[in-house]
């Protein structure tokens, strides 16, 4: 029997596994895909957010700011490509700049350092390719960019090196509560071979499918909507078109279309935000890609879209409550959710790992190695 079984080997599950590998515990990670980082974690904006957008007091706010703070040491210790290039949220002449004032106020309440609102003249010194309609912007120097593949792989490899077992191509089909433990029935996705796992604690880090596992064991039902985001990746020749991550004023659907350099020297434009019923729908659409070019031009002019080298789409796990769901299910002792992890999930991942591992350690009275 395992002390802890983690469902999902994305950046969240892998971060939790790494933190748990510091304890005297028998831990496994169960992943239905053929490798780690094969779901939401592989198709996102690759941004380490500063933390000014989340509602003060929310888990998103607390964990975003903490995760951001952890990135310098993590990137050094685990050799994760990471750069603090800073971010700008720009306001155009058709928008009310009070939206920037609100972001500034939220950011200051969340403890984000160095925030300030800049006028157009100063913005153009930083980013000459801003659109002619941009009037002002919020500057966040602690914003950064990262490689989500390297980040997830680094967490997983470090966890594995320190004793965590990984079971890939293994799909969880059912979870049953027992006295003091859980039984997980799984099937190998290549061979259809069934396998049973038993664990004292289950950690649900299953992305867009996290509600399904919660609802197997708890009467407190979750509902997660898959929100599809499409992206265009441009050639490295376009990589210097902007140097900061350029955001638009956020809406209820997200942070708008961003234009950002990547840590590998490309330029990334995206995402769209469309709710879908199919939780496997990672296809791109012509309408979606066309809208990216049009919407990106509102904040950055002359984006060289003819230099697009690939496009892709990913799914965000949006929960109806608009916050991360982290903690033990009230009516399922030993079942810990890390669910509804949408933006700023990548930024928050190190802190989520820290928090969830701490919850599991307290439940099991684990001691550090």
What name fits each language-model region?
Residues 2-29:
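N-terminal Rossmann-like FAD-binding beta1-loop-alpha1 element of flavoenzymes
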Residues 12, 35, 209:
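Conserved Rossmann-like nucleotide-cofactor binding loop
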Residues 15, 175-180, 184-285, 294, ...:
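Flavin-dependent oxidoreductases
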Residues 22-42:
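Glycine-rich FAD pyrophosphate-binding loop
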Residues 46-126, 256-257:
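Dinucleotide-binding Rossmann-like beta1-alpha1 core, especially the glycine-rich loop
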Residues 55, 62-65, 90-99, 138-157, ...:
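Short beta-strand to alpha-helix junction loop
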Residues 138-200:
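Helical element adjacent to the flavin cofactor pocket in flavoenzyme catalytic cores
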Residues 254, 263-264, 280-369:
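C-terminal catalytic lobe of FAD-dependent flavoproteins
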């Amino acid at each position: 029997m395992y002390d802890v079984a983690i469902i999902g080997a994305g950046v969240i599950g892998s971060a939790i596994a790494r933190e748990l590998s510091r304890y005297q515990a028998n831990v496994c990670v169960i992943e239905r895909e053929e490798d780690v980082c094969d779901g939401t974690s592989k198709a996102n904006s690759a941004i380490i957010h500063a933390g000014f957008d989340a509602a003060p007091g929310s888990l998103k706010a607390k964990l975003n700011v903490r995760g951001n703070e952890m990135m310098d040491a993590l990137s050094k210790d685990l050799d994760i490509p990471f750069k603090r290039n800073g971010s700008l949220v720009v306001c155009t002449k058709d928008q009310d700049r009070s939206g920037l004032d609100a972001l500034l106020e939220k950011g200051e309440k969340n403890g984000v350092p160095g925030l300030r609102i800049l006028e157009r003249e100063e913005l153009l010194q930083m980013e000459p390719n801003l659109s002619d309609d941009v009037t002002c912007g919020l500057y966040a120097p602690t914003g950064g960019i990262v490689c989500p593949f390297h980040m997830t792989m680094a967490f997983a490899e470090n966890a594995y090196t320190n004793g965590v077992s990984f079971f890939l191509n293994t799909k969880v089909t059912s979870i049953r509560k027992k006295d003091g433990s859980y039984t997980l029935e799984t099937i190998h996705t290549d061979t259809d071979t069934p396998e049973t796992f038993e664990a004292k604690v289950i950690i649900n880090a299953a992305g867009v499918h996290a509600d399904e596992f919660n609802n197997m064991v708890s009467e407190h039902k979750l509902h997660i909507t898959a929100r599809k985001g499409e992206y265009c990746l441009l050639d490295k020749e376009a990589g210097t078109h902007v140097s900061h991550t350029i955001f638009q004023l956020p809406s209820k659907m997200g942070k708008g279309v961003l234009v950002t350099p990547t840590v590998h020297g490309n330029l990334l434009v995206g995402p769209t935000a469309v709710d879908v019923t199919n939780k496997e729908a990672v296809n791109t659409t012509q309408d979606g890609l066309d809208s990216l070019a049009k919407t990106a031009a509102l904040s950055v002019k002359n984006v060289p879209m003819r230099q697009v080298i690939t496009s892709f789409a990913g799914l965000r796990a949006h929960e109806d409550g608009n916050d991360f769901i982290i903690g033990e299910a009230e009516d399922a002792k030993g079942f810990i959710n890390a669910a509804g992890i949408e933006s700023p999930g990548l930024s928050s991942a190190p802190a989520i790992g820290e928090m969830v591992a701490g919850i599991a350690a307290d439940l099991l009275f684990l001691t550090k190695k």
